[in-house]
Amino acid sequence: MTNIRKSHPLMKIINHSFIDLPTPSNISSWWNFGSLLGICLILQIVTGLFLAMHYTADTTTAFSSVAHICRDVNYGWLIRYVHANGASMFFICLYVHVGRGIYYGSYMFMETWNMGIILLFSVMATAFMGYVLPWGQMSFWGATVITNLLSAIPYIGTSLVEWIWGGFSVDKATLTRFFAFHFIMPFIITALTVVHLLFLHETGSNNPSGIDSNSDKIPFHPYYTIKDFMGFLFVFVILLTLVLFSPDLLGDPDNYTPANPLNTPSHIKPEWYFLFRYAILRSIPNKLGGVLALVLSIMILIIMPLLHTSKQRSMMFRPMSQCLFWMLVANLLTLTWIGSQPVEHPYVLIGQLSSMLYFTIILILMPLVSMMENKMLKW
């Protein structure tokens, strides 16, 4: 008799995706982050569902409902902080996942890569809307500033902003619709993730060497299930340490003050995982220019396959490209720091130089260095 996992229509899909999936034998721990993102997504959906049971999307009660969750609901504080810090873990995994894709040339799987970019946009939008829900000072002013960026769009900008707000300012209508979208988006993200995996399994996984691995594949289970489980444990320990010892470490103290449209915080800034984008936005003194730079800083990922001039797929054997890659990482960390600083000298100048360097490395230096490496290898 055939094994049920190989004959049952539903089990067969799971079997081909997670059990008997032929996987390159040499993929490193950098490949763990895809499965970690899946776990983060499940964790966010579960904790978010329980939070939604007690949260009220109304400007008069939103802030106090979050306080009620922390004080009166059984383990409400735990659910709330796992959700808030889970978002941070989500973005750490997301950025490492994208970084690994750039380093090892995974962007050459065009469909998977483009689907991943759509997922990145979706997760960013969801996180932004979630940050507005506690209705603290930073929630309110963050929503006001970021949605206001759309007013930079010529001709339709102002109408578009008022349409999103549902009025002439961020108010009850805005909060209600943000809650509705924040609730539905994770399920859309789950569906997009299935498509992302579908495209990936059409081609099979890339590997650190960047060369075809069809001659050397091993089953996903038990080799990579046990390896992924090790990754889960690491992330779980870090998340729990954060939640139980310093749950507000990555948050903003201003968000413990109820939203007040008449009082602007001295320094409006988004969550830490958006700070480098925010620094790029601020580095251009023109509103439309800043918005364009912000959008292009993410959209630039789409043209990654077109900028690939090397004869080798991976950076594993390309030391000059490796140096550039780590320069890019250091530059993004600098931008993250700049985004958290006030708009004054020398932060403005450092931000402008770092923003310029970000685009220069990706658009000019990486393709040029790849061509130089080809020449050095007489290819």
Curated annotation (Swiss-Prot):
Residues annotated as transmembrane: 33-53, 77-98, 113-133, 178-198, 226-246, 288-308, 320-340, 347-367
Cofactor: heme b
UniProt cofactor note: Binds 2 heme b groups non-covalently.
Any matching Pfam family: Cytochrom_B_C
Keyword line: Electron transport, Heme, Iron, Membrane, Metal-binding, Mitochondrion, Mitochondrion inner membrane, Respiratory chain, Transmembrane, Transmembrane helix, Transport, Ubiquinone
Binding-site residues for heme b b562, renumbered to this chain: 83, 182
The UniProt record lists the keyword NADP: no
GO BP annotation list: mitochondrial electron transport, ubiquinol to cytochrome c
Gene Ontology annotations for the cellular component aspect, listed alphabetically: mitochondrial inner membrane; respiratory chain complex III
KW Heme (keyword) present: yes
Molecular function (Gene Ontology), one example: ubiquinol-cytochrome-c reductase activity
Positions with a binding annotation for a ubiquinone: 201
Topology of this chain in the membrane: Multi-pass membrane protein
Alphabetical list of InterPro entries matching this protein: Cyt_b/b6_C, Cyt_b/b6_C_sf, Cyt_b/b6_N, Cytb/b6-like_sf, Cytochrome_b, Cytochrome_b_C_euk/bac, Cytochrome_b_N_euk/bac, Di-haem_cyt_TM
Binding-site list for heme b b566: 97, 196
Compartmental location: Mitochondrion inner membrane
Family as reported in the entry's similarity comment: Belongs to the cytochrome b family.
Its job: Component of the ubiquinol-cytochrome c reductase complex (complex III or cytochrome b-c1 complex) that is part of the mitochondrial respiratory chain. The b-c1 complex mediates electron transfer from ubiquinol to cytochrome c. Contributes to the generation of a proton gradient across the mitochondrial membrane that is then used for ATP synthesis.
Further comment: Heme 1 (or BL or b562) is low-potential and absorbs at about 562 nm, and heme 2 (or BH or b566) is high-potential and absorbs at about 566 nm.
Matches recorded under PANTHER family: CYTOCHROME B
Assembly: The cytochrome bc1 complex contains 11 subunits: 3 respiratory subunits (MT-CYB, CYC1 and UQCRFS1), 2 core proteins (UQCRC1 and UQCRC2) and 6 low-molecular weight proteins (UQCRH/QCR6, UQCRB/QCR7, UQCRQ/QCR8, UQCR10/QCR9, UQCR11/QCR10 and a cleavage product of UQCRFS1). This cytochrome bc1 complex then forms a dimer.
Protein name (Swiss-Prot/TrEMBL): Cytochrome b
Organism: Fukomys darlingi
